[in-house]
């Protein structure tokens, strides 16, 4: 099972820290994980030129090419963003918009994957829920199944109060509780997904050699 995590922060700081923590936990539970950080990457905005509709690929040749490959390969996707202006980062927004080139190749290319959201705000109520909703909207548009940690603490995903420092986010016990609860549900859905997929293969006549 492959899990791909995207850190939408332009820095390798608090958002990167909690995403890496999440992926390390999954890795320890037997999942194959990979982290893509927007730090130092060149990913331009979607120009909506419709080149992808005709040529089945994006006209821009930048670091988004790596993201395209990993999005197709993963079973689970974690989107982690700092809260900026009450929403997601411009870096993550560009990645979302540029996914259009994948859909131009195959409308269902991301359908059935499992999605999870992480939002990190400088304030406790700094807009984390709005960031989650944007991530969840992206999941739903592309047929990705969004997973949260459930009611009472992690309704939409893992929410953190960073106070803009690594040392302070490490002290956010409530945030890490929301992360652990969301990861638990994320793992359950991933394992259920692979069970359903494997059962479908067997019914389709697939045989283990």
Task: Label every PLM stretch briefly.
Residues 1-106, 152, 156-157, 161-209:
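N-terminal beta1-alpha1-beta2 submodule of the flavodoxin-like/Rossmannoid cofactor-binding fold
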Residues 108-152:
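Short, glycine-/small-residue-rich phosphate/pyrophosphate-handling segment
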């Amino acid at each position: 099972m492959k899990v791909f995590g995207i850190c939408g922060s332009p820095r390798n700081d608090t958002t990167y820290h909690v995403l890496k923590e999440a992926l390390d936990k999954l890795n320890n539970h037997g999942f194959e994980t990979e982290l893509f950080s927007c730090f130092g990457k060149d990913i331009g905005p979607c120009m909506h030129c419709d080149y992808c509709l005709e040529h089945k690929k994006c006209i821009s040749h930048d670091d988004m090419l790596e993201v395209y490959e990993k999005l197709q390969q993963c079973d689970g996707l974690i989107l982690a963003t700092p809260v900026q202006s009450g929403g997601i980062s411009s870096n993550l927004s560009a990645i979302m918009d540029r996914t259009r080139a994948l859909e131009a190749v195959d409308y269902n290319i991301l359908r059935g994957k499992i999605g999870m959201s992480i939002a990190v705000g400088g304030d406790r109520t700094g807009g984390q829920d709005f960031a989650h909703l944007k991530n969840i909207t992206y999941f739903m548009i592309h047929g990705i199944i969004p997973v949260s940690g459930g009611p009472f603490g992690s309704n939409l995903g893992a929410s953190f109060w960073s106070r803009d420092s690594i040392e302070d986010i490490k002290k956010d016990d409530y945030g890490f509780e929301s992360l652990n609860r969301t990861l638990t549900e994320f793992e359950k859905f991933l394992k259920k997904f692979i069970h359903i997929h494997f059962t479908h293969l067997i019914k389709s006549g697939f045989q283990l050699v």
